[in-house]
A protein has these predicted regions:
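Donor nucleotide-sugar binding loop of glycosyltransferases
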Residues: 16-19, 43, 66
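Hydrophobic helical membrane-anchoring modules
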Residues: 1-7, 18, 146, 170-261
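Short, well-formed alpha-helical segments that are part of the catalytic scaffolds
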Residues: 15-29
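Short aromatic/hydrophobic "clamp" motif used to bind/position activated sugar donors
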Residues: 82
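Acidic donor-binding/catalytic loop of UDP-sugar-dependent glycosyltransferases
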Residues: 45-46, 85-102
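Acceptor/aglycone-binding surface of glycosyltransferases and processive sugar-polymer synthases
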Residues: 62-64, 68-76, 94-172, 203-213, ...
């Protein structure tokens, strides 16, 4: 619970049998998570049994792909604040508080893994992936004149329930480049968002995408083509996010009250 709102964490799993139980328990251990929803996307044998040892709720998405699993999770989660994360141990559960702090002011809070000081030794964020994610994010920032962006592929993201449903109902990408589509749909809908740095740790096991350089390049190219298609269809002048509902500029007292909720 955060500020009187239920918090759901959505994990999409395919090859994370050895880490998913610890990740689920880590999020419940933060004390602010009311629900962990796991979308089993044809996961490896034994994964469902590991999930069953926890308090998490499990749903099954037979259509293979990150986008299909994410869409299912956004629609199924019961919380008023919905946080997407990975079950592979790369994210710190306590970093959820960084996202929640901004949820009072923004309908979407996006994590970024490209802050050098928060990339842990051994994390799968070598120069190619780091600068590739940064470059594609900057392409979006420039083409759509958005707020600051530095990571197109970070799963660690928070959405209010309405924003989550709006994204899910308009998603078309079922594959690994769906993260870029989610970001683009957030932007073109005029959703107020902000990006915050999160820790990025070594993965437990091998990623089916970023663990193979050629696949990572292919996903990057798919993202760029998707961005260009969105830009061609989008209006010349993008909708501005709604103004904050404050009758005065935020003060240190306001920030203190938010943190204490």
């Amino acid at each position: 619970m955060w500020g009187g709102k239920r918090v759901s964490v959505v994990l999409m799993t395919y090859a994370e049998r050895d880490s998913i139980r610890a990740v689920i328990e880590g999020f419940f251990g933060t004390g602010v998570v009311d629900e962990v929803l796991v979308v089993n996307n044809n996961a490896q044998a034994g994964t469902a049994e590991e999930i069953a040892k926890t308090k998490a709720r499990q749903v099954f998405e037979p259509r293979q792909g990150y986008g299909h699993a994410t869409r299912r999770g956004l629609l199924e989660a019961s919380g008023e604040l919905i946080v997407l994360a990975e079950p592979d141990g790369t994210f710190v559960p306590e970093d959820i508080r960084k996202l929640l702090v901004y949820s009072d002011e923004c309908d979407a809070v996006l994590g970024t893994r490209t802050t050098r000081e928060l990339i842990w030794h051994g994390a799968n964020m070598e120069w190619f992936l780091r600068w590739g994610n940064w470059a594609v994010a900057k392409l979006i920032e420039v083409l759509f004149n958005t707020s600051h962006l530095s990571d197109v592929g970070c799963t660690y993201r928070l959405f209010g329930r309405k924003a989550a449903r709006r994204v899910a109902e308009t998603m078309t990408v079922g594959g690994s480049h769906a993260g870029a589509e989610i970001l683009l749909l957030t932007i073109v809908s005029g959703t107020r968002f902000v990006e915050v740095p999160v820790n990025y740790l070594p993965r437990v096991g091998i990623s089916s995408v970023t663990g193979e350089p050629l696949k990572a390049v292919a996903v990057g190219l798919q993202m760029i083509l998707l961005i260009l298609r969105f830009r061609r269809r989008a209006p010349r002048r993008m909708p501005r996010p709604a103004a904050l509902g404050l009758d005065h500029p935020p003060t240190s007292e306001d920030a203190h009250e938010r943190v204490e909720l």
